[in-house]
From Swiss-Prot:
Residues given in the record as Mn(2+) 1 binding sites: 269, 347, 349
The protein's required cofactors: Mn(2+)
One GO term describing the cellular component: cytoplasm
Name of the gene this protein is made from: pepA
UniProt keyword annotation of Hydrolase present: yes
Primary location group: cytoplasm
The protein, known as: Probable cytosol aminopeptidase
Cell location: Cytoplasm
InterPro entries: Leucine_aapep/pepB, Macro_dom-like, Peptidase_M17_C, Peptidase_M17_leu_NH2_pept, Peptidase_M17_N
Role noted for this protein: Presumably involved in the processing and regular turnover of intracellular proteins. Catalyzes the removal of unsubstituted N-terminal amino acids from various peptides.
Binding site for Mn(2+) 2: 264, 269, 287, 349
Amino acid sequence: MQLQTVPTAIPDWSGDLLAIAVFQTEGTLTLTDPYTTLDQRLNGLLQELINEGEFQGKSGTSLLMRLLPNFPLKKLLLVGLGNREDFNLEALRRTAATIARTARRERAKTLGMALPHETLEAADAAQAIAEGVILALHSDVRFKTDPEARKLLPYPEVVTLLGLGEQTAALTRAQQICDGVILARELVNAPANEVTPVTLAETAQQLAATYGLTAKILEREDCGALGMGAFLGVAQASDLPPKFIHLTYTSPGTVHRKIALVGKGLTFDSGGLNLKTQGGIETMKMDMGGAAAVLGTAKVLGQLKPPGIEVHFIIAATENMISGRALHPGDILTASNGKTIEVNNTDAEGRLTLADALVYAEKLGVDAIVDLATLTGACIVALGDNIAGLWSNNAELAQALQKASDRCGEKFWQMPLENKYFEAMKSQVADMKNTGPRSAGSITAALFLQQFVDHTPWAHLDIAGPVWTEKEDGYNNPCGTGYPVRTLVEWLCSLSS
């Protein structure tokens, strides 16, 4: 698919499908320029159809019409943007996704899109529209053999953005960002017999070779030498070797900020001896969603090459399996900072792997650490499927992440680090247990992770809900969403300016 901007006036564009987005009105929509010119060329047909359908431009509504055979446009699509006061970049992304999916269903080879940008910068609008199109049209059919699954993939061939001026740089940036999102999606979508800890390590090495990053892979023995007892305790039941992945992006020139991103990398989570049951185990290939997003972000930075920053991408990759070597409930592990952990639930394993990864990250002397993990079902209970939980020991870091998420439409909600709740995680035989009581489960998980960060500004993102969707939603398709690659890229690039 080719994305482009052209100076052609909206009424002069010709092709298979022209999509026009309009704001909501109190009554039936009355066309204004430049659409009145188009309506005049159609002898008033457009306004007539709007009146018949009582189209008001409400969000989520659309009106598709086939035009006269001799007209240079084959079809015209009106899409509602909703209230003008609610208009933002995310509205553009979601509207663009609706248009792109319609073009594919209608088998339109050429698609013209006329979307307003109001007070938004034209470059930002072009990037948001392009992101919506690319992500909506991404279809992961790698494991399908039926040709029917691929018959619509060629559509549309060319997408033209109208009324935004020349925006080649914005479209290129959108494609590069979406490349990272799609990598994250496809890592999450692939089954655990395809994406293993070895696969994640190989992916990191490929990214390093392609984009000029540096990759360091620690094997089981290396991790043992560093005292990573928590990570290796989880890994000991699997027949597959664990891989501790350290990928680094260093910008050209002077580095002003050093950041570590730590992603949970459980390529399959059976729950261990606290075995998951039917209804909870089938989708546990997605338990490496944090690692997938970290690698997706690395891919984007390798292409954008923002100045002034050094970013460390860290993943403790393993499976959580059952075998004669598996962790028992009640076992005590020693993390690499010397703290001891009584494992009272083997299905709370992600925090154990993250514990050693956080200690490792802090020893790098970074200015901030952000970990992201499909950590708790409790966070989904609290915030639902579309919002991630955010915990931080640093207000400035939390605000910066929130600002980036607002621009990208990937929602976070800040949650409290209520230290009193950690009292319930204290162990009679070790420094702490790995889980607390049933209540406030996402908060106690964050408090557990905080024990492995001494002084560095740190944020924890529990992405268990939004990393996966069962249904089409905006520009997200069923399965992995690639959340929150775009937010991380936005935040990291803001540090380089």
